[in-house]
UniProtKB/Swiss-Prot annotation:
Keywords: ATP-binding, Cytoplasm, DNA damage, DNA repair, DNA replication, DNA-binding, Nucleotide-binding, SOS response. NCBIfam families: recf. SUPFAM superfamilies: P-loop containing nucleoside triphosphate hydrolases. It is found in: Cytoplasm. Belongs to the RecF family. InterPro entries: DNA-binding_RecF (IPR001238), DNA-binding_RecF_CS (IPR018078), P-loop_NTPase (IPR027417), RecF/RecN/SMC_N (IPR003395), RecF_2 (IPR042174). One of its GO terms (biological process) is DNA replication. GO terms for molecular function: ATP binding; single-stranded DNA binding. This is DNA replication and repair protein RecF. It comes from Porphyromonas gingivalis (strain ATCC BAA-308 / W83).
Amino acid sequence: MIIEELHIVNFKSIAAADCRFSPKVNCLVGNNGMGKTNLLDALHFLSFCRSHLSVPDNMVVRHGEEMALLQGLYRDESGDGIELLLSIRPGKHKVLRRNKKEYERLSDHIGRFPLVIVSPQDYQLILGGSDERRRFMDQQLCQQDPRYLSALIQYNRHLQQRNTMLKQDRHDDALMDVLELQMGSYAAEICNKRSRFIEDFLPVFNDLYSDISGSAEKVSLSYRSHLADGIPLEELLRRSRPKDYLLGFSSCGVHKDELEMLLGGVLIRKIGSEGQNKTFLISMKLAQFRHQQLHGDETPILLLDDIFDKLDATRVERIIRLVGGNGFGQIFITDTNRKNLDEIIASWSEDYRLFKIENGQIFQ
């Protein structure tokens, strides 16, 4: 999958832009705060109908404007052209059209235009709470498996309903029994698929970390779930119900799962240096790309947002050699330093385009 053209109106700091991209390498250069990340976020929005930066929709519409528009012209691996048109109005439902036909449900779009982004904000994957790591697993699985996406939506809907009931003065145990049984069914599917995903993902991640770091450091991932002991969630929820009534929320379930990230058998967030954390993160995201490529119908678009800062020259060279090789499709790279991008371009024989970003304006 590649994007050939992107047209932007009133998205964040970008008032208007018309971009035509290389099918291989696209380099964006500009100082911080000029709009490089906003352009990448527009690409992310077209794939996932939300910002990579987890900001609400009303914050992506340019200040003082009523609506933002994003239009992308794509070409899939069979050679077919596809137009996406997304309109965003504060306080309104987003409207997404594919070849002029509106999606009835935005969830039907997820996974059809695969994209992987590596950015400084991804540090929360290592340093943040467990919800960040669950989101990583969910994003990957939702792109590949519509049944997983459906199970996750239903589980979260029932979880919200249970939490509402836990806050009520009147306790309806019969209704709670039914609700927990339904949650147990969805949770079993979610847990099983998360577990299998990590089993498939781990060898790919290990190989990439070794390639980038050039060291024998042992890294690993460990999936932890309340369901790991084989007790159905409905039974766990029934047992925890008295405590949950006191707490006012559901204290167990797959919404509490954890993905432990380990360096030498110890949580990397406790011992990792800045360089080790960044190498771990980039390896995770490139493994996400590889896994999506292996299990999906289309090669994802890869966005690399200011990833070379805090890395030594040897690791930068290894990453460049890795993503510049066969198997990676269309790539977008941002940097504040034109010299860095020139060195990257010089090391590749691929077709490329260079864009300069200044105050929300894009020059080619």
